Amino acid sequence: MKQEVLFLLLNEYADWEGAFLAISLNTGVIPGSEVKYIPKVVAPTLDVVRSVGGFRTLPDYSFQTMPADYAALVLVGGMHWQSPEAELVVPIVQDALQRGKIVGAICNASAFMGAHGFLNDVKHTSNTLPYLKQFAGSA
């Protein structure tokens, strides 16, 4: 059975940022290999989430209905990672990390992770150091 990789989207998400990972998961990490994962979308509610590019995405799960059993959580970057909406993601990330889940964050989502101290004790990449300091501070 395929394991789900949850792509967490906020409104005004960066639609291009999760694309290559989702393609690899959905078709086999190595071309022709067994497909072990399936990408699924999680958003604050089950309402349509709109991307920066204007795409409208219907989530598979809301924050309240997302499964407890999944392979990984991917926070896709976008324009709302410094918003009150993003604060709803903190307990989701805390729970994922406590349960040993893989958690990835792209672009602005990595600054969100830094701002909440999730990157303090792990090696990570992000945008430029000045950018990370601006949005994540010294958390």
Q: Across the structure, where does each feature detected by a protein language model lie?
A:
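Extended, subdomain-level signal for the structured scaffold at the beginning of enzyme domains
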Residues: 1-99, 112-121, 132-139
